[in-house]
């Protein structure tokens, strides 16, 4: 009997069930992924016991010589991965990384430009519900109604009109390549700083499959999960001249002690990301997303912007007579996990929506390729077109189960679950 089962059987059972859920369903949420056993091992290590306020070599606690090794490895590997001057691996999340940048570069009430959440942006880019929308004067930009891609002319017009202190670039539901050079040129016209949040596309950026913002932006933030396939956490990079202020805004500005077991796991993930195999994996993510998109379009589904350049796609269900919420629930009942998502100019609220967001990082981690994506597109279409037919949904669920068995996940853990 495991220590956890003996101490807390309720939590042990929840973990067992979640293990089986992940292994037995098709995970298509764009922000989720499956970390390696090595990352899991590091994340669950005894470094969780160590307090280490401060930075390597400059801690407020004794006994940090070995956690310093882990943090220095994470920093140097991340620098090599992105070609950054300065990296801070302590942020607990992407939002806290963004917060550290804001507190480093802005004063309360300063004007920032950020992508409209309803057009694919992120809460921490100026949503009124988030601290960023409460502390700063936020001017949202969005996508063009016809192309559904970022309207750079609008961005420039807004920048010239409002003279922002910072332009925030990045998205949580945008399927196309972001032109960081254009944002840099616009910012230079008004003397603005640029922060790029690459949380969703970090793996693609690290492997050269998406243009990098690091050479052209003062600040770059990211999560360490999603396409980077590391533990849940954040990081922030900046040009050398900003590092002293930024480091003091991470600690003690917005955080106390870093999570050293998570930083150790970040170091492992960064090492994995520096391999040729990881580049092949990222390339396959994009191939899979594009294969999935092509098959869905062929089956009569409209995708926002007409397709994808990266790891995700947005399905517009407006003309299908169902909401994103209904689609998510129907697909989940058949073993396919997606999330309801607003589409640009959506008339439905965020808890209902007119679309769903689909991503390929997790299934690519399982080894699935274009052939499986075409099968999955067919299964998605069958569920949405026969969502009231219980017999049909069960047939899809059985096919999903067979597909998952052919691409096993965490085999040893499943065997003991």
UniProtKB/Swiss-Prot annotation:
The keyword Secreted does not apply. Its EC number is 2.1.2.1. Its cofactor is pyridoxal 5'-phosphate. One of its GO terms (molecular function) is glycine hydroxymethyltransferase activity. It is found in: Cytoplasm. One of its GO terms (biological process) is glycine biosynthetic process from serine. Belongs to the SHMT family. This is Serine hydroxymethyltransferase. The lineage of its organism: Bacteria, Pseudomonadati, Thermodesulfobacteriota, Syntrophia, Syntrophales.
């Amino acid at each position: 009997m495991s220590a956890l089962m003996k101490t807390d059987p309720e939590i042990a059972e929840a973990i067992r069930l979640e293990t089986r859920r992940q292994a037995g369903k098709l995970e298509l949420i764009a922000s989720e992924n499956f970390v390696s056993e090595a990352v899991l091992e590091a994340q669950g290590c005894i470094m969780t016991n160590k307090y280490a306020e401060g930075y390597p070599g400059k801690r407020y606690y004794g006994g940090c010589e070995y956690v310093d090794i882990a943090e220095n490895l994470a920093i140097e590997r991340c620098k090599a991965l992105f070609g950054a001057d300065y990296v801070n691996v302590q942020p607990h999340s992407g939002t806290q990384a963004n917060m550290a940048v804001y507190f480093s570069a802005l004063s309360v009430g300063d004007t920032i430009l950020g992508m409209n959440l309803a057009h694919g942006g992120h809460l921490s880019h100026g949503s009124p519900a988030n601290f960023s929308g409460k502390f700063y004067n936020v001017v949202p930009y969005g996508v063009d109604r016809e192309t559904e891609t970022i309207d750079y002319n609008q961005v420039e017009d807004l920048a010239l009109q409002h003279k922002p202190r910072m332009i925030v670039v990045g998205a949580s539901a945008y399927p196309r390549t972001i032109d960081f050079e254009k944002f840099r040129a616009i910012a230079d016209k008004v003397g603005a700083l640029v922060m790029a949040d690459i949380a969703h596309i970090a793996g693609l950026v690290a492997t050269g499959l998406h243009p990098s913002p690091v050479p052209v932006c003062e600040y770059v933030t990211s999560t360490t999960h999603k396409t980077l396939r590391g533990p849940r956490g954040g990081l922030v990079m900046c040009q050398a001249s900003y590092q002293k202020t930024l480091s003091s805004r991470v600690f003690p500005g917005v955080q106390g002690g870093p999570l050293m077991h998570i930083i150790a796991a970040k170091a492992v993930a960064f090492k994995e990301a520096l391999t040729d195999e990881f580049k092949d994996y990222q390339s396959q993510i994009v191939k899979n997303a594009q294969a999935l998109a092509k098959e869905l379009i062929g089956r009569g589904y409209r995708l926002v912007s007409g397709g994808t350049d990266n790891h995700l796609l947005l399905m517009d269900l407006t003309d299908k007579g169902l909401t994103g919420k209904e689609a998510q629930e129907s697909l989940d009942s058949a073993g396919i996990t997606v999330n309801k998502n607003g589409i640009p100019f959506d008339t439905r609220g965020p808890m209902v929506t007119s679309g769903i967001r689909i991503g390929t990082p997790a299934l690519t981690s399982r080894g699935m390729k274009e052939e499986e994506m075409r099968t999955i597109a067919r299964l998605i279409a069958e569920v949405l077109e026969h969502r009231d037919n219980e017999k049909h949904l069960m047939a899809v669920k059985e096919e999903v189960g067979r597909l998952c068995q052919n691409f096993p996940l965490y085999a040893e853990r499943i065997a003991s679950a």
